[in-house]
Amino acid sequence: MKISFPAVPVTNCDERPAGELPSLVVVHAISLPPDRFGGPGVEQLFTNRLDPAGHAYYATIHHLRVSAHYFIRRGGELVCFVPPERRAWHAGVSSWRGRERCNDFSIGVELEGCDSLPFEGAQYETLAALLAELCDRFPVEGVAGHSDIAPGRKTDPGPFFSWSRLRRILLKAGRADVAARVEPDEVGQGGDPDRRRWPFPLGSRPL
């Protein structure tokens, strides 16, 4: 799998707790500026170079110190910001299966997208391939959305992300073992647009 890396090293990360291996993959969505794609904003945010004068929204977030392990652009290109062995700062206040501090034991994957538009086929293909690789390398038990580990606080990856499509790609690739770890239920968690029943207000929540 072809992976690119940011021009500037990411410092918004640290070490996981001793002996901790990632057991969860969290799927996010991000667009900077909101609902616009293809620009340098995401890399600038993760490398602490976001210009607050570059966009009105940037003035509200440029101070944040956040990151993710991976970023999948609209065309399917994969960028690695933080090695999966290290702890990226992507989950915030969160809980999964009764355990808090999901950053400690999760891998964060940001898709370039928003709550109001479908994701691209190339993004699903790259995500499926990445999940298969991560499940081969680490004891991953589940794949969940940011909204699943921070319900009511986060909405991403949003109602236009199709968990069933991701599962189908994994099954077609012969990775039923990985598909079985994709947790969210389409009904009540967003998913396919024709089935969405979103449990909290929508909005462009890129972080």
Model-identified regions with their sequence ranges:
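Active-site-adjacent loop/helix surface patches within enzyme catalytic domains
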Residues: 1-18, 24, 29-141
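Basic/polar, cationic surfaces and motifs that engage anionic cell-wall
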Residues: 1-3, 18, 100, 105, ...
